Every structure is written in C-alpha cells, then in structure tokens.
C-alpha cells in the first residue's frame, strides 16, 4: 500500500511539473478581444514574456517586452516564482526517483530512501505553492484592472494558461503531500507489506546492565547493614 501511494504521488508530481512548464511557455495568460459589428476584429493575448495580436484575416504578430526593468513589478515577480517552482520541481523529481521504494538507484538503505522521498515531497509542495502564488497574483491584477472603471488601458480576461497553472500547482501539492505523508506513516510499518509492526521493548546492552548491577547491590548491602542495628543497640 505504501509503495502504491509513493508511485501515485510521484506520478502526480511529474504531471504537475510538466503542466507547470507548459504554463510558463503558454502564450495566453491574459486575453483581450475587440469585437466589431459582425466579426471579431482583433484578439490580443499576452504571457510573461511577449504580447501577440491576431486580426480577423488570421495575421499573427508577436513582439517581446522591450525591457525587464520597464515591466510591472508583479510580472517580474511572477517570472521569478514560476522559474523557482520549475527548478524545485525538477530537484524534487530527481530526489523522488531515487527515494522510491520500487527503484534501486544508488543502492541506498530504506531509511535513507524514506528521507529522500519526504524531501522530494516537501520540494514539490513548495513548487506548487510558488506556482500558485504566481498564477493567482497575475489573475488578481487582471480582475482588478477589468473591474476598475478608472482604468483607461486595455482590459484583459483570464487566459487558459492560468487555469492550466492552477491545475498544475494542485497536482504538485497533492503529489508532494502523498510523498511526504508516506514517510511519516512508514516509520512503524513493515516496508514490504505496510502492516503495523508489533511493539518491541527497548533492548538494554549487556555492558550497561552489568554496570548498573554492582551499584544496585552496594545499595542493598548498605541498607541491610544499617538494618542490623536497631534503636535498642544504642540504648
């Protein structure tokens, strides 16, 4: 059962990481459509790197943002968060591959594999949180400008990349929780069957036990020698 949970969590994190990469490269983070009397005359869509426009004739033009310093602060922060999420996801994917019980990469012991799997789960949870913050922050700015009556610029709507990003972050977090919680649940279980192991009393080494016996014997002798003399012996 524990092995199945680990494999399921690893699969979720791998799919989540792939979807995060697609989200970062997706062109439609926000979309604006200009409608004419009969047909759609112009469609503008942007992501974190460039802006594109498509007219009614199907002509497609894209241009990159001129300078990183000229961008809004939240776009720069979203870039950093998404790149951090993908790097954490790749590191977690590698550690998870090594830490799975069903793999024999590196020939590690079970205890080390469990720790690596837990570390991989924590990294995937952090990656999902970073991606979730980036996507949600970007969506917040879109909705704020859209419903602001004083905003004179182009009003955009949420693009499909944001929904893809939310799904990717959710998969990464769920997979990371499976890997991390599986480490906590496997401490007192049989690694092969997943059955709860019976309680074992702590074993006291023979050397420490022998060191304790003379001290206890001397205490008993002192008590017995003191007991030989009662109150009447001093009268």
Swiss-Prot record:
The modification Phosphoserine is found at residues 111, 218, 225. The record marks 55, 64 as: Important for Na(+)-selective paracellular ion transport. GO terms for biological process: bicellular tight junction assembly; cell adhesion; monoatomic ion transport; paracellular transport; regulation of intestinal D-glucose absorption; regulation of intestinal lipid absorption. It is a multi-pass membrane protein. Coiled coil: none annotated. Residues 146-147 are annotated as: Important for the formation of tight-junction strand-like structures. This is Claudin-15.
């Amino acid at each position: 059962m524990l092995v199945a949970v680990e494999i399921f969590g690893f699969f979720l994190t791998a799919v989540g990481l792939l979807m995060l990469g697609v989200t970062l490269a997706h062109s439609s983070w926000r979309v604006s459509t200009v409608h004419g009397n009969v047909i759609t005359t112009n469609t503008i869509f942007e992501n974190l790197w460039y802006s594109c426009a498509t007219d009614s004739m199907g002509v497609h033009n894209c241009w990159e943002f001129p300078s990183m310093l000229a961008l809004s602060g939240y776009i720069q922060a979203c870039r950093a968060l998404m790149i951090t999420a993908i790097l954490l996801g790749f590191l977690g994917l590698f550690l998870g591959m090594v830490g799975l019980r069903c793999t024999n990469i590196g020939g590690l012991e079970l205890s080390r594999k469990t720790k690596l799997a837990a570390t991989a789960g924590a990294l995937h949870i952090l990656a999902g949180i970073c991606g979730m913050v980036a996507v949600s922050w970007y969506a917040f700015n879109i909705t704020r400008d859209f419903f602001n009556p004083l905003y004179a610029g182009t009003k955009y709507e949420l693009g499909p990349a944001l929904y893809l990003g939310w799904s990717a972050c959710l998969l990464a977090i769920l997979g990371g929780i499976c890997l991390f919680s599986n480490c906590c649940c496997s401490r007192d279980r049989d690694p092969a069957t997943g059955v709860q192991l019976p309680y074992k009393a702590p074993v006291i080494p023979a050397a420490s036990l022998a060191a304790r016996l003379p001290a206890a014997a001397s205490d008993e002798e002192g008590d017995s020698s003191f007991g030989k003399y009662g109150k009447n012996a001093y009268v």
